[in-house]
């Protein structure tokens, strides 16, 4: 990857994903930056794909939104044709295919895909070339080196979703402290057997001080 392309992917943003025993937690900051310019301080980097699936976005906003639209379409189509939710692994493979088909003029995005299906919780990282990795925990963006410090210290294989919310929030909060491309608040979503839930400010404040 050239330095210029890598900078486009890594500059700005911190997103975190954690697979818990009973669900998946997705977390991200709210700052959109262009170089040293803060373009937006209320950016939603967590997107619902279906009732049982969501993703986080890092990289180019337009490219990421295009991918979200395609995934939502196919998730809805699967529900109609198969009378049920699309497996998370299938969504991850579809995302990989979208990236791979455009490798000549790649989408500038890095995706964390999480959800809860018949198999249970699942978390994947899909990069701009279509590589797919299943993860227990992962972070992307320019603040990821800082966030990994918190994740590697606090992650346990037996974390519940309630516990994982705190770990994810603390990881992104640490990145906000040390990374200029990360900031302006934190969003967090939980995906489990009850569906996709984006936490309110009051719910987040009940977990950690923001």
Swiss-Prot record:
Protein localization: Cytoplasm
Pfam families registered for this protein in UniProt: Proteasome
Catalytic activity: Cleavage of peptide bonds with very broad specificity
InterPro entries: Ntn_hydrolases_N (IPR029055), Pept_T1A_Psome_bsu_arc (IPR019983), Pept_T1A_subB (IPR000243), Proteasome_bsu_CS (IPR016050), Proteasome_sua/b (IPR001353), Proteasome_suB-type (IPR023333)
Predominant location category: cytoplasm
Activity: how regulated: The formation of the proteasomal ATPase PAN-20S proteasome complex, via the docking of the C-termini of PAN into the intersubunit pockets in the alpha-rings, triggers opening of the gate for substrate entry. Interconversion between the open-gate and close-gate conformations leads to a dynamic regulation of the 20S proteasome proteolysis activity.
The family this protein is said to belong to: Belongs to the peptidase T1B family.
Protein's job: Component of the proteasome core, a large protease complex with broad specificity involved in protein degradation.
Record protein name field: Proteasome subunit beta 2
